[in-house]
Amino acid sequence: MKIAYVFLASGAVASIAATSEHRSSPFTAVSSPPPSCSSHPAPTENIAAQLAKFRPVRMPFSTAGLSAKEVSMVRKLVEAGQDLESIFWRQSDPEGLALYKALANCPRPAEQQIRHYLLINGSRYDLLEGNKPFLAGAVYEPGHALYPAGITRKEIEDYVAAHPAKKAEIYNPWTVVKRSGKDLVGVPYHVEYKAFLVPAAKALRDAAALSDDKAFANFLRLRADALLTDDYYKSDLAWVDLDNPKFDVIFAPYETYLDDLLGVKTSYGVAVMIRNPSESAKLATYKKYVSDIQDALPLAAADKPSNAGHPTPMEVMDAPYRSGDLRHGYQAVADNLPNDPRIHAEKGTKKLFFKNFMDARVNYVVLPIGKLLMRQDQANLASMAGYLSVVVMHEISHGLGPAYARVAGKQADIRESIGPIYSGLEEAKADIVGLYGLDWLMNKGVLPKTRARDYYASHVAGIFRTVRFGVAEAHARAEMMEFNYFVEQSAITRDADGRYAIDFAKFPGAVASLAHQLLDIEATGSRTRAEAWFQKYGTMPAELQAALAKTGSVPVDVDPITSFGENVR
């Protein structure tokens, strides 16, 4: 869930200075002793080559313009974030964490390369290549360490059908599912991860005591309470209500990217952010028309939620520290949170744009790959400004569309109804509804129609970046489907020389028809239809795979280097 030249100065990047088969509790030993420097598992792929796909980029913490008290507050927020990083590893791959720690003082470069690739992925599984194990002996299971080893979705569904009173416990986004004899139980996160949540909550309260912003301090105290109860509702309301804060944090288990078993379990993520006020102010144009775009969506009126919460906060921030699911694998350049549909109905959502991460991605990845794969005149249309606009509307669009599904005449949670494919469906909906919203803004004269080619070219260049190393990750699955649909509609064609071109006359119609399909799938909560749609459109075409094979000189993503270190325990 995820901006630039309109907001960013030229050359901004320079200023950036740059589950295994055995799933243990985080508080019990793994099945075998931690490996030593001489006995670690052998790589199953060329780790040096994998690391070379990432561009290291420094994301420093600049204290310029901050008081000593503010610097201390930021450091307390980071301290709390490091506790949540320790939890994330235990959700993702406890045995991978044991190996990461065991290799800390190993002297050989090969061992440090393994350790660094473990850090990039937060596990022994390549998050950008379909969770493919990259070390011998690692066996991936859906749902990582959030479920018992060997369990299947069918087993869970059959158990819940036989024990309906257990459904809320098993499907709760904030429980770890475990076996208890022949039964399944859901252990609350605040119980399972208490050893890390208690110090994290204390650090948040310490940060609150250092804040001169009373509303932000109040939010931090509420969020500290939420960590110890798994009830984030009150603190989420306070978070969305923050008015142009100088500092902000993402600090919760929000996203379900680790859970490809049921698609409901959340993992912890953290971003410590410092606001860029001048860039944030430029988002006003988009904020003004959010409810109008919602009204204009190709969706039945009954499926459109109340607009009472719109428009909602949008902020451009630098993020000098991230951890958990915001640190590993796909490096988000923006976010749209919280995910609670109750908050959507009452307040909407907060859209956050990570300026330093956006700069790095566009300069180092998106524009270079577009120049290799797109027809040259169209590749030159892709820009920081275009990509920014596409990402802004993507994040706005996560909060648009149905808030609930209609299932058997009743309201149902969309995420639960759709199942594991939900993450990909929702990312695609945000992409396509975002483009639909840009078309609406241009048709209403809010944005100049001359920008259309810029927007479309920037989005297509972004598709190539997202899918080039596989289509298992949610964003890649979404954009692979979009690409194939656009090709089917002749909105994207392939020239005789193998370069791709956009048919600018057909593209808006293809966007509108795809928006209708995706919104309707969410509104009806049809898992069968969602899975069939991605089955039809989700495969990488051979000719695109061959074209992407020529992009080896372009990084797959950035590898952020912060001023704070990892400090995982």
Task: Map each language-model feature to its residues.
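Sec-dependent N-terminal signal peptides
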Residues: M1-E21
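Secondary-structure edge/capping motif, primarily at the C-terminal ends of alpha-helices
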Residues: Q91, A207-S211, G525
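Short, hydrophobic/amphipathic alpha-helical patches that form generic packing surfaces
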Residues: E79-R90, R115-S123, V176-R179, K202-D206, ...
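Amphipathic heptad-repeat coiled-coil/leucine-zipper-like oligomerization helices
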Residues: Y100-Y189, D503
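Long, well-structured alpha-helical subdomains associated
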Residues: L435-E531, K536
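Fold-level signature of zinc-dependent metallopeptidase catalytic domains
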Residues: I47-M59, A64-V74, D83, H163, ...
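N-terminal mature-domain "stem" immediately C-terminal to a signal peptide or N-terminal signal-anchor/transmembrane
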Residues: F27, S32-Y125, G130
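Extended, compositionally biased alpha-helical segments that mediate assembly or anchoring
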Residues: A515, L519-R569
